[in-house]
Amino acid sequence: MTEVSMSLTGHLKELRTRLLIILLSFFLAFFVGLFVSKPLILFLQKDDLPKEVILHVFKVTDAFQIYIEMAFIIGLILVFPVILYQLWAFVKPGLHASEQRITLRYIPITFLLFLCGVVFSYVITFPFILKFMFQFAAELGVETTIGLATYFQFLLQIVLSFGVLFELPMVIMLLTRLSLITPNGMRRARKYAYFCLLIIAAFIAPPEILSHLMITIPLIGLYEISIVVSGFTVRRMDKEMNMKKML
């Protein structure tokens, strides 16, 4: 067997081991989610909804479906740091010692950004959209009837989307380090980026202008923060390059 094929076999075994660890970790996290899901669903109903609004089930399977979906989402969130670490461990042999230290720091920051997106959308964006919709329905003299599945799927759509989108600064930092983008390039592409963010917000928000703005504005803020992050990364890379030249 050649050295290349042995190396390939070793990488495949390593990949299988990492995937197995992720899979087992997810099953454990999903098991935890089964215990947490029910009290979390009860809390979210009491915390978000006005007292006069009652959730309904329109299909026999709705309640159980949401229970399993919530447990699945909890499992994914809990296993997210494990996925990041296993990914880092897989590519670690191909990195220099300094790169290993830097990229390892990305793991807690990435997870923290995801949680910040979830918390931000749950505390600010989602309540605003919900309050506006209920008030608008009341002004029209319409009684609000919400399905359990529809409500929680909408909630998850908002908070998970924001969790993912809050990773933008980290993605920009990585792309900047790979010399794929620059802060000046991001500034020049600002109007195109804003247009793309408007389209992304349209997929997340209901078809209503205020709700759409409540999602678009934070996304634009994230883009501007990402430009700053990209600039900081470029300056740091230049500093590292100058230090290497001095050695």
Curated annotation (Swiss-Prot):
InterPro entries with a match to the protein in the record: Sec-indep_translocase_CS, TatC
Membrane topology recorded in Swiss-Prot or TrEMBL: Multi-pass membrane protein
Pfam families hit by this protein: TatC
Cellular compartments per GO CC: TAT protein transport complex
Keywords, sorted A to Z: Cell membrane, Membrane, Protein transport, Translocation, Transmembrane, Transmembrane helix, Transport
Coiled coil: none
Main location: membrane
Transmembrane feature ranges: 21-41, 71-91, 109-129, 154-174, 195-215
PROSITE patterns (UniProt xref): TATC
Subcellular location field: Cell membrane
Highest taxon of source: Bacteria
One BP term from GO: protein transport by the Tat complex
Gene Ontology molecular function terms on file: proton motive force dependent protein transmembrane transporter activity
Subunit structure as annotated in this protein's UniProt entry: Forms a complex with TatA.
Family, per entry: Belongs to the TatC family.
Role of this protein: Part of the twin-arginine translocation (Tat) system that transports large folded proteins containing a characteristic twin-arginine motif in their signal peptide across membranes.
Name the UniProt record assigns to this protein: Sec-independent protein translocase protein TatC
Annotated source species: Listeria innocua serovar 6a (strain ATCC BAA-680 / CLIP 11262)
Gene name for this UniProt entry: tatC
